[in-house]
Amino acid sequence: DEPVIVVQDRGRVVRVPAGEVLYLKAELKYVTVRTAATSWLVDESLSELEARLGSRFIRVHRNALVARSAMARLERRDDPDGHDGQEGWAVQVRPTGEWLAVSRRQAAAVRETIAAQ
């Protein structure tokens, strides 16, 4: 059975299959669940989601998990997190083309994952 993430959406409950999730990103008190079609906010911690969803996702930063299958490439980028003048590693998520910051500590693991695809 594929794990699901249960989200509240305008008064209804939606079950999002983990296989449709491109990334999970923690922002303040919520986690953004991003699919190719849309985004939702959930009130579950990133650590809880990481434990529940298993190896399908890789932690790229303290605030983000990316689906291994959604990682297109890793490169040095100016301002991946919007901090003026800083350069850092970032991973491009397919099919949306969005870039997410990758911590220095996680860059090698992300590089290996992309190379193994």
Regions found by a protein language model. Give the residues of each.
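Conserved binding/recognition cores within well-folded domains
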Residues: D1-V102
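C-terminal output/interaction extensions
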Residues: R104-Q117
